[in-house]
Amino acid sequence: MIIKYIQLLLKIIESFFIFLFVYLIISFYGGMISTGDLQADGDYCIYVQSNGIHTDVCLPTETEVIDWSTFVSKGPFSDEGSFEYITIGWGDKGFFLNTPTWAELKMSTALTAAFLPSETAMHVQYSKEPEVSESRVKVYINESDYKNLILFVKSSFKLKNEKIDLIRGKGYSKSDNFYEANNSYHLFQTCNSWTNNALKTAKIKTGVFALFPHGILSHL
C-alpha cells in the first residue's frame, strides 16, 4: 500500500514538472514571436512600464478621443498630485490588495494567484507624464488604434450601476486606487497577458503570447 502511495506521489510530481516545463516553453517562445508594429510617430504617445514582474499602460489623461477623468473620477485621488497621465493595470485582486510591498507577500496569496482562477482588480494611478527608462518605454499610436485600446481598457473594469466600482481604502498611497475588474486571473491569464492583449488590440508590437514582462518590453 505504501509503495502505491509513493508511486502515485512520484507521478504527481512528474506531471507537475512536465506541466511546468510546457508552461515555460509556451511563455518563452510565445514572448519571442512578434506581432503588430512600432510607429516612429503618431497622434498620441503612451507608455508601457514594468516593475520586473507586473506591467501597466500609461495613457494621456485628456485627449480629443477621451477624458479619462470622466470614467475614473479624480475625486478619490489626492488633488496634490498631477493628473497629466493615468496608469492602469489589471491583476489578481488578492495579490493587489494584500501585497503593497514584496516583503508582505504571503505564500498562500502567491499560490492562489498562480494555480486557482481568482477575482481581479484594476490598479489606477494619476501622475505627471512618465519619463522613459529601462523599465518604461514610450510608444506612439494613431487615433483609430488608440480608440481600440480605450475600449479594451474600459471593458476590463467591472461596472456597478453603470459606473466603475471603487474598492475603498485599499490604495497604496493618496495617488492610486483599486477598482473591481472583469475576468479571472490564472496561470494563462496574468497581469502581463492583459497588457499584452491591450497592445495587440491597438496593433502595437508585442509578443504573440506574453505571460511575463520580457515578452512585452523586448519588442518595444
Residue ranges of each PLM-predicted region?
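Alpha-helical transmembrane signal-anchor/signal-peptide segments
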Residues: 28-51
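Glycine-rich catalytic cores of cysteine/serine-nucleophile enzymes that process amide/ester linkages
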Residues: 46-140
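Activation targets extended, charge/polar-rich intrinsically disordered C-terminal tails
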Residues: 2-28, 36, 155-220
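N-terminal short leaders/motifs
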Residues: 1-12, 34-39, 63-80
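Second-shell loop/turn segments in exported
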Residues: 132-142, 179-186
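Internal catalytic-core helix/loop-beta-alpha segment
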Residues: 136-156, 161
